Swiss-Prot record:
GO terms for molecular function: 1,4-alpha-oligoglucan phosphorylase activity; AMP binding; pentosyltransferase activity. HAMAP family: AMP_phosphorylase. It comes from the Archaea. It comes from Methanococcus maripaludis (strain C6 / ATCC BAA-1332). This is AMP phosphorylase. GO terms for biological process: AMP catabolic process; pyrimidine deoxyribonucleoside metabolic process; pyrimidine nucleobase metabolic process. Its EC number is 2.4.2.57. It catalyses: AMP + phosphate = alpha-D-ribose 1,5-bisphosphate + adenine; CMP + phosphate = cytosine + alpha-D-ribose 1,5-bisphosphate; UMP + phosphate = alpha-D-ribose 1,5-bisphosphate + uracil.
């Protein structure tokens, strides 16, 4: 047992941790990464030991701000460290690593210990990896989904018909929700949209919307905003909706994986938590996204529909083209600009963005009774073209605490590099993967001003020296790294009509 004085450390390690001087660990049974119980007069919290020679002095224990708040420990207060019991879920994680099926108790225990921070990031990574490699059956996924939802807040609505649109993501520039949600809300459809931050893409819906307004809303704020406007665009993590999901996402993000069991559970847990009774799931299909072909897409769609039936949620899925970025803007600020431009002047907006936003909104307009079957997309266009969607979008921004902006008022990264066409020819490929990696290298999504603006899309003719795309960053160093990466991976490929000359057999 160790008795040490608490010292505040302004650091976020993504898990509960305590930082102990090497001298205090010598001759004890405590080692780095050991799990300990930190006790004070006000309570206790579990954390993992990290050792240091300089960050804290002998006799001190560095504690992260979240831990201090959890147990109301004051700086300088003496705390007691003792070995904590191994989490109950460790053998269950090993069981899944061996490819075995988990029972409901085992799944619920894993999720509960994720939320209570009893699992370290290493242990959580092992669980995520096990589901990525070995998968889960539908009973396991259903149980995991329900438990993820139950660990957080649950929102209920007075109206019986509450709908939602959700994309599984993977497509750079996938900003359709900033058009579809205000279209639906303007038609009187109740659609409380909560989104994750980016996992595998350079910007999630919440990241883009955060450029324009506050997205960290509490339950009562969401209810008030939806009652006033019919819709919202909020970050699910701000509402304490399915908190286990956000913890899992933080482990998935560094390695850019989104295991299908977690994907299904993440999407549907948020629907349970927000009281959604009907949802349309967008499944982008194409090179460089999560789903490579229509057969895979149809298989995933059937899983969503089956899971929805087990959870009493009506699910309809649509397969959409995901072979290149949606629109021309990739990155939070650039996407926010493009969305507002599309709301202001839809006739001159990228056709891919308009078509996707209208198609998805049209389905829910028909479901909600605002349009006859087969007439939803037409009504969606009328709402968009008339300016009603822009008006509703600005109302949502205002109600969420922001101030509506003109596109040109949204700041972009001050460090800019234009990438030009090396030859005359045609754009034959735009790699989603390469675009995503370059934009992330430029700093997105954390740097909201970072991104790429495409000048041309697949099939467009270009001449040598034409600008193919522009990279933006808020950091000169990050821009240099992004440009160097772009020159290695060629996100936009230009080829002439002559592919290869062959003169010998």
């Amino acid at each position: 047992m160790l008795f040490l004085n608490a010292k505040f450390i302004d650091l976020d390690l993504g898990e509960n941790a305590v930082i102990v001087n090497d001298e205090d660990l010598k001759g004890t049974s405590y080692y780095p990464q050991d799990r300990v119980l930190i006790e004070s007069h006000a309570g206790a919290v579990i954390g993992n030991i990290y050792s240091t020679k300089t960050m804290v002095k002998k006799g001190e224990v560095g504690m992260l701000v979240k831990e201090l708040k959890e147990v109301s420990i004051s700086e300088g207060e003496e705390v007691k460290l003792r070995h904590a019991e191994k989490p109950e879920s460790i053998p269950f994680i090993k069981k899944k690593m061996d490819g075995q099926v988990l029972n409901p108790h085992e799944i619920r225990t894993i999720i509960d210990e994720i939320v209570s921070k009893k699992l370290s990031n290493i242990e959580l990574s092992a669980f995520v990896s096990s589901t990525y490699i070995n998968g889960m059956n539908m009973d396991e996924i259903s149980e995991m989904t329900k438990r993820i939802a139950e660990t957080g807040d649950m929102i209920s609505w007075e109206k019986s018909l509450v709908v939602d649109i959700h994309s599984i993501g993977g497509v750079p520039g996938n900003k359709y929700a900033l058009l579809s949600i205000p279209i639906l809300a303007a038609a009187g459809i109740t659609i409380p949209k909560t989104s994750s931050r980016a996992i595998t893409s350079p910007a999630g819906t919440a990241d883009v919307m955060e450029v324009l307004t506050n997205v960290e809303l509490k339950e009562e704020e969401i209810k008030r905003i939806v009652k006033t406007t019919n819709g919202c665009l909020a970050w699910g993590g701000g509402v304490n909706l399915a908190p286990a999901d956000d913890i899992i996402i933080n482990v998935e993000r560094p390695v850019s994986i989104d295991p299908q069991p977690q994907l299904l559970a993440s999407v549907m847990a948020k629907k349970i938590a927000t009281g959604i009774k009907y949802t349309v799931i967008d499944i982008p299909v194409g090179k460089g996204v999560k789903i490579k072909n229509e057969a895979e897409g149809a298989k995933l769609a059937r899983k969503f529909i089956e899971l929805g039936e087990l959870l009493n949620i009506k699910v309809e899925c649509v397969l959409t083209y995901g072979g290149q970025p949606l629109g021309r803007a990739i990155g939070p600020a650039l996407e926010a600009r493009e969305a507002i431009e599309a709301l202001q002047d839809p006739k001159n907006a990228p056709k891919s963005l308009i078509e996707k936003a209208l198609s998805l909104a049209g389905i829910l307009l028909e479901l909600g009774g605002a349009a006859q079957i087969g007439e939803g997309q037409k009504l969606a266009w009328e709402i968009l073209e008339s300016g009603r969607a822009l008006e509703k979008f600005n109302q949502i921004i205002t109600e969420q605490g922001g101030t509506p902006k003109k596109p040109e008022e949204i700041e972009l990264g001050e460090y800019v590099e234009e990438i030009i066409a090396p030859i005359d020819g045609y754009i034959t490929d735009i790699s989603n993967t390469a675009i995503t990696n370059v934009v992330k290298e430029a700093g997105a999504p954390r740097d909201k001003k970072a991104g790429i603006l495409l000048n041309s899309k697949i099939g467009n003719q270009v001449k040598q020296g034409d600008i193919l795309y522009t990279i933006y960053s808020g950091s000169e160093e990050r821009l240099v790294s992004a440009v160097n990466l772009a020159r290695r991976v060629y996100p936009v490929k230009v080829e002439g009509m002559l592919i290869e000359r062959i003169s010998k057999f």
